[in-house]
Amino acid sequence: DVDIWKNQIVLSRTKISGEFTDNWTRLNLANALDLNGTKGDISKLINYRDSVFAFQDHAISQIYYNEKEQITTESGLAVQLANSNKLDGYKVLFDKIGCSNKWSVCVTTHAVYFIDDENKSIYMWGGGQEAPINITDKNGFNAWIRKALKENEQWTFDNFITYFNNSTSDVYFVNNDNCLTFNEIVNEFTSFYSYENTPYLQTMNKEFYMFRNEVNGVTMWQ
């Protein structure tokens, strides 16, 4: 129950092609991990560069899962030992930066982007030990994001949603009134587009599509 166990991660069984019972619905409560509740709820889990990270309101942590250890036998042969798909613990990487709006987290091939409502900033993070970069402060958009951010409702689309267009390397920060674009190639905010109030954008086969709520229903644009 996400309303009760807001700081707990539980592993399912491994999904197998052609299985009769969906293993993702079979949770093993003996294999669970509780994060520090003082850092807020877990809003988002991501898999980035072969590592799992958890976002809380006031922290970003790395989740240690199925960690491998290399040992050397008496014969000098190197052997890797794994812990059979178990959660090994976690490490808090940053405790003054976090994210409560899961829809604002966007993973690209270059970085992870997210909005910290508490600090009222947009961050770009490379997924390592180095702290995320506040790209709104760096690029002169601090006043704009503070005005554009609304009271966060993390389970709705009322606040910002972040999307990535892999054909142009553009990252879109979209809410009901704005669409601010950051380009990964030039590493700058480049423009405001008329994609505001767009609940879904997607790149397929190098073509960019968006779905919008109109008076007569949902429309698709290319």
Please give the residue ranges for each predicted region:
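Long, low-complexity, polar/charged, intrinsically disordered or flexibly structured peripheral segments
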Residues: 1-30
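Homeobox/homeodomain signature
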Residues: 14-17, 25, 35, 50, ...
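Solvent-exposed, flexible loop/coil residues
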Residues: 28, 39, 193
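A short beta-strand motif characteristic of beta-propeller blades
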Residues: 28-35, 89-95
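Long, low-complexity, acidic Ser/Pro- and Gly-enriched intrinsically disordered regions
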Residues: 35-36, 68
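A general structural signal for stabilizing positions within well-ordered secondary structure
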Residues: 36, 43-44
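Beta-sheet-dominated scaffold domains
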Residues: 43, 49-51, 57-222
